Amino acid sequence: MTKVETRLEILDVTLRDGEQTRGVSFSTSEKLNIAKFLLQKLNVDRVEIASARVSKGELETVQKIMEWAATEQLTERIEILGFVDGNKTVDWIKDSGAKVLNLLTKGSLHHLEKQLGKTPKEFFTDVSFVIEYAIKSGLKINVYLEDWSNGFRNSPDYVKSLVEHLSKEHIERIFLPDTLGVLSPEETFQGVDSLIQKYPDIHFEFHGHNDYDLSVANSLQAIRAGVKGLHASINGLGERAGNTPLEALVTTIHDKSNSKTNINEIAITEASRLVEVFSGKRISANRPIVGEDVFTQTAGVHADGDKKGNLYANPILPERFGRKRSYALGKLAGKASISENVKQLGMVLSEVVLQKVLERVIELGDQNKLVTPEDLPFIIADVSGRTGEKVLTIKSCNIHSGIGIRPHAQIELEYQGKIHKEISEGDGGYDAFMNALTKITNRLGISIPKLIDYEVRIPPGGKTDALVETRITWNKSLDLEEDQTFKTMGVHPDQTVAAVHATEKMLNQILQPWQI
């Protein structure tokens, strides 16, 4: 018998629960831009963007987002977390222009008694008052059962009575949160299944937390039990270990269940980068789906297998997410790794040169030196007996910055046998350097790629004289939707000088007519 494919709703909680990540606070414009991207490009079904009554600034932010949403007919896809506090939350939401209240109720007897000091009967009366007032105010209501995961395990009768009470109210959905991230997949199935068996007509959704790194697995079991929606955040932002990561959740749903979502997979990477930049929380290189290294093969045997029929490919293809497969260079590289990188550079090597390049790459890897695809032309020139000299050399760079002075830079570079000098100011030392450099390159008709990312890596240990590694990502395409990115790296005890070295490498990369 063929199973019927179900379509699940996804509520993105990046802007509300995700903002509870330590050190994360989105500005109004950042929240607006993220909300636009989530709803219009990533195509999440709904977004939760704020908690009611947090601050005047938060009210103004919600008002801005709702003004935009009204012009796009998206107001009912935007939701606000609210509280059982009489008419206060509802009035706040009315003032904000929002149309949907996600009411936070107590999903365990322990929370109810210890935090509120009320009986279930008293609390249910309070909940009903808020719901009735919200409906009269023209709002739609969903209900969170906070700490439900502990509630159904330790006070099941209370949970049953609360859901029974809510089943008689005019609400849209009931949310089942694993607030403290304590559930196993088996427990998730049991808890969700027990409610859906008794209340099959209620729209239940599961809200996971990742304390045991089980939130995606728990979500799969919630699907198996029959939930109609799931909650997630971009990059897994959230309290403690975070919420269920949307990128991994959606991919797993599409590949490992009989369900689908409305999510546009190819926009996942861009959503991840957007939130990474605005949150200031870098994602790890090996984070599934969106990490920098997850579509990179390091072992030479893998590159060889891919070349001979994609022997090491899996269903998580990079093209699904707007990305490309790459092959790392180092002591584990093989000829296939080298040839694939050379091919991407638009070059063809003889077997003799290819072998020499491989030997040099392995030698550098043994010395614990990072080799990037952008280094290959220089290595090829060297092993081929060519000079591999720089086309452009930064002869000197004096950068001054400090407290009470405007940063400024004076640079001197040599290009095609001529010396070029320039002075400029900037918002920082490197910005002043780039402003001076741009004046020169504009005169020379050289177009500088757009700087996409600037990353500084300092080794642990706290030594003030430690070598700093600065990696800069550039995009050669004026159309940022087109991926022509490449990285250059500089190493120096001074962070800004390391960035200058990385920039010099970038200039030689775009100016060198490599033809080996």
Swiss-Prot record:
Enzyme Commission code(s) on record: 2.3.3.21
Cofactor detail note: Mn(2+) is the most effective activator, followed by Co(2+), Ca(2+), Mg(2+) and Ni(2+).
Domain Pyruvate carboxyltransferase: 8-269
Impact reported for Y144V: 114-fold increase in Km for pyruvate and 5.3-fold decrease in kcat
Temperature dependence (free text): Optimum temperature is 35-40 degrees Celsius.
GO BP, one annotated term: isoleucine biosynthetic process
Induction: Expression is repressed by isoleucine but not by leucine.
Catalytic residue list: R16 (proton donor), E146 (proton acceptor)
Effect ascribed to mutating Y454A: 1.4 decrease in Km for acetyl-CoA and 17-fold decrease in kcat. Still inhibited by isoleucine and weakly inhibited by leucine
Effect of Y312A: Loss of activity
Cofactor: Mn(2+)
SUPFAM superfamilies: 2-isopropylmalate synthase LeuA, allosteric (dimerisation) domain, Aldolase
Organism superkingdom: Bacteria
Reactions performed catalytically: pyruvate + acetyl-CoA + H2O = (3R)-citramalate + CoA + H(+)
Record's comment describing the protein's domains: Contains a catalytic N-terminal domain and a C-terminal regulatory domain, linked together by a flexible region. The catalytic domain consists of a TIM barrel flanked by an extended C-terminal region. The active site is located at the center of the TIM barrel near the C-terminal ends of the beta-strands and is composed of conserved residues of the beta-strands of one subunit and the C-terminal region of the other.
Protein name (Swiss-Prot/TrEMBL): (R)-citramalate synthase CimA
The species this protein was found in: Leptospira interrogans serogroup Icterohaemorrhagiae serovar Lai (strain 56601)
Encoding gene per record: cimA
